[in-house]
Design a protein with these regions (language model features):
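Phosphate/nucleotide-binding beta-alpha loop and adjacent structural elements of enzyme active sites
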Residues: 1-232
Length: 232
């Protein structure tokens, strides 16, 4: 019997909340995490790959961080790009922390002013990199995604352009977990207006939405029993 371990932020961890609320018995699913950092530390999706047999697609823009992601998640599809509303290149601001050095996951194409001021107050410095940008439909095609159970979007203030690109016509996830910390719950709901997502809940700095056209399957009694027997 494998002992479950969660990797996400906060208490309860984000991945535990996702697992217990939306995917308590699903095995062999597909996850997409944008802003995946090194693929393990504070990851909302690694649990599903490690313990539930999912395939993970990870997107990370930071040049210093992406090689760590490749080493940590060799079984995943790892994409070195920044999700946005246009394809091409853009300036990515990588953050260097006085405590953690370059291993810090607050980089962004567009920090919100309050977040940027907070990072400066903490003594952080910044290095600009020219990085590849990719739209949501291009990402789905490039990663070969034909099924998507979970999309976790946490790109430090650049969520609005990424959500805009989700309107361009591509496969949408059954469950969307998006960081609302820089905007608030209600503003995030406005950003997602017109897309087929129903607000489900909010926890810590994340909002959770269910795709009304393709919701996650509700596990039956037999599936729940089998999952308890397996114990992993």
């Amino acid at each position: 019997m494998n002992q479950r371990r969660y990797y996400g932020q906060f208490d309860p961890p984000v991945d535990q909340y996702l697992f217990e609320r939306f995917f308590p018995t699903l095995r062999g699913g597909v996850s997409l995490e944008c802003g995946s950092y090194d693929g393990i530390a504070e990851s909302s999706c690694y649990f599903f790959e490690k313990h539930r047999g999912w395939h993970g697609v990870n997107v990370e823009a930071s040049p210093p961080i992406f090689p760590q992601l490749q080493r940590n998640r060799p079984r995943s599809t790892n994409v070195h790009a920044a999700l946005s509303n246009h394809s091409g290149t853009a300036r990515f601001k990588h953050v260097i922390s006085p405590q953690h050095g370059e291993n810090f996951g607050n980089g962004s194409l567009a920090h919100q002013p309050a977040h940027h001021a907070e990072l400066i107050k903490e003594g952080c410095s910044f290095v600009d990199y020219e990085v590849r940008t990719i739209t949501y439909p291009e990402l789905i095609a490039e990663a070969g995604i034909v099924r998507l159970d979970l999309f976790v979007l946490d790109i430090e203030g650049h969520e609005a352009p990424a959500i805009e690109s989700m309107r361009q016509g591509a496969l949408l996830p059954s469950v969307l977990c998006v960081e609302h910390g820089h905007f608030g719950v209600e503003k995030m709901r406005e950003m997602l207006g017109g897309l087929p997502f129903r607000f489900d809940s909010a926890l810590h700095v994340n909002s959770f939405y269910v795709n009304e056209l393709n919701p996650p399957a509700r596990p039956g009694a037999l599936a729940k029993l089998w999952d308890r027997v397996r114990g992993d």
